[in-house]
A protein has these predicted regions:
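N-terminal catalytic cores of secreted or lumenal carbohydrate-active enzymes
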Residues: 9, 14-192, 227
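Structural recognition of the beta-strand scaffold that forms the well-ordered cores
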Residues: 22-30, 66-72, 76-79, 136-140, ...
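Active-site neighborhood of glycoside hydrolase catalytic domains
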Residues: 172-191, 201-306
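C-terminal beta-strand-rich structural cap/linker in extracellular carbohydrate-active enzymes
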Residues: 441-469
Length: 469
């Protein structure tokens, strides 16, 4: 039991004075891993429920994701009426070729123009996710269908810094995505919350020798495409589905792209998405300010890195919650090798390895900061806080990077900062190795304060009941 004598090397005061909107959720993209493993119920339990699941002989706490991003593929292996076929990058990784539904250059209205049987595994995982409570679904595109591109290569233009969507296919790309959204609603039982027609569009990493699908769009073209998509969704009775944009690679690119859109383009967008690959850099505040000035919210719709220890994840996630004020956060590859996956896996061979330490770091956020909570000011650069108004519960997640120390948490700015002497539940994960979502019942409130001893490189989550703003 932590002694009821105040002791701390650091103190942070949680403030309810400012809230940053309701938290919408945590999630994961389904491409590419679900195309390989989409038939596995245990993976669906692990990612989309908060149940404990036995996996490879180990009991794993479910992450409780409630957001999925479903990828509209760009690849097909049939021949167009003019005899053309898809051009495949010499460096393309086969498991990153996602099946597309629209047959090349065929009439939109005929049933034979669409092959709705492909991509069964990714759809299966989306359905499993829905049955486990997922309630935000985003349809996104890495590239238009290959036959809409200038070089028939869904990895990108021969020059990765040039547009690869043919000008006369801007609307066709929008039609493709809107048609999938309509099919999902009418036949799959899934209503997409949003549709994103772009993926890191201003970057130039895409190209004809790429290892994955990708397509460069200059900013004027992006503006046109989101307008087309808004109109195509509306024409199909899908006006409640948001258009999201632009999933730029970095925060700074996202700000520049958003500010470049004209009034019609901005009015067509219902939410701004960014990726988190600027990591510890970039001006998150500028993006937040630009987006909120337009009355919208921002998602970090894709984050990933190769650090299996969890150090980068917790550092960058805390930066997002403190400065970007995103209302959702989505991880890229749930299963992958080289440290990228939350679970180590070789998608090419279909083999699955161990759960990474960063999985357990992420669990400290996803299992406790839940949809509908309000993000508060944590009072320091190592603390984030969320408040559940219906349960009158405060969630605190904090990390200690330096030498082992006591950290004191001060709740005196709340009208009721818990109940003196009450138990504060806590969970702990150590970065790199050590504790993996370990649960402790040894921490108690002393007035409106409590403290805990943090080893070096340790992340903890605390739940405090009977807190009133």
């Amino acid at each position: 039991m932590h002694r009821l004598v105040e002791r701390a090397d650091s103190t942070t005061t949680i403030s309810p004075a400012t809230t940053y909107g309701k938290w919408e959720g945590w999630g994961v993209s389904l491409a590419w891993w679900a195309a390989a493993f989409g038939d596995q119920d245990d993976l669906a339990d692990i990612f989309f429920s908060t149940d404990w699941t036995t996996f490879n002989g180990v009991s794993i706490p479910g992450l409780g994701f409630n957001v999925v991003r479903y990828n509209a593929g760009a690849c097909s292996w049939n021949t167009a009426p003019d005899g053309s076929t898809m051009v495949v990058s010499p460096d393309m990784i086969s498991t990153r070729q996602m099946d597309g539904y629209w047959c090349p250059r065929t009439d939109l209205s005929t049933a034979s123009s669409w092959d709705w049987t492909v991509d069964a595994n990714q759809r299966a995982m989306m359905t499993k996710a829905q049955s486990r409570g997922v309630n935000y679904f985003e349809l996104f595109s890495n590239s238009p269908m290959w036959w809409m591109t200038t070089n028939h290569n869904p990895s990108g233009n021969d020059d990765g810094s040039n547009n690869n969507l043919q000008a006369w296919n801007y609307d066709q790309h929008a039609i493709y995505l809107a048609s999938i959204a309509l099919k999902a609603k009418s036949s799959w039982g899934v209503t997409f919350t949003s549709v994103e027609p772009l993926n890191e569009p201003y970057d130039s990493w895409t190209g004809d020798t790429g290892t994955q699908e990708g397509c460069h769009f200059d900013r004027d073209t992006q503006n046109e495409v989101v307008i087309y998509l808004r109109n195509e969704l509306n024409s199909r009775g899908l006006s409640s589905i948001l258009v999201s944009a632009s999933d730029e690679n970095t925060y700074d690119q996202a700000t520049a792209t958003w500010n470049s859109f004209n009034s019609t383009g901005q009015a067509s967008v219902g939410r701004v998405n960014t990726h988190g690959y600027q990591y510890g850099g970039g001006d998150r505040v500028a993006l937040y300010d630009a987006v909120t000035a337009s009355g919208l919210s921002v998602w970090n719709s894709e984050y990933g890195e190769d650090d299996a220890t969890g150090e980068q994840l917790v550092s960058n996630l805390i930066l997002d919650l403190i400065w970007l004020h995103n209302t959702a956060w989505v991880y890229w590859q749930a299963l992958d090798g080289g440290g990228w996956g939350l679970i180590d896996a070789d998608v090419e061979t279909g083999t699955i390895g161990d759960v990474s330490q960063k999985y357990y770091v992420l669990a400290l956020f996803t299992r406790h900061i839940r949809e509908g909570m309000y993000i508060l000011q944590g009072g320091s650069d190592y603390t984030v806080a969320a408040y559940d108004s219906s349960a009158e519960k405060l969630i605190i997640v904090a990390v200690n990077w330096g030498s082992a120390q006591y950290i004191n948490f001060d709740l005196s700015e709340f009208s009721q900062g818990g109940v003196d002497g009450a138990l504060v539940k806590r969970w702990s994960t150590q970065i790199g190795s050590g504790d993996q979502y370990a649960n402790f019942t040894d921490t108690y409130l002393s007035g409106t304060k409590f403290w805990s001893y943090f080893d070096e490189d340790t992340v903890m989550t605390f739940e405090v009941d009977n807190v009133v703003i």
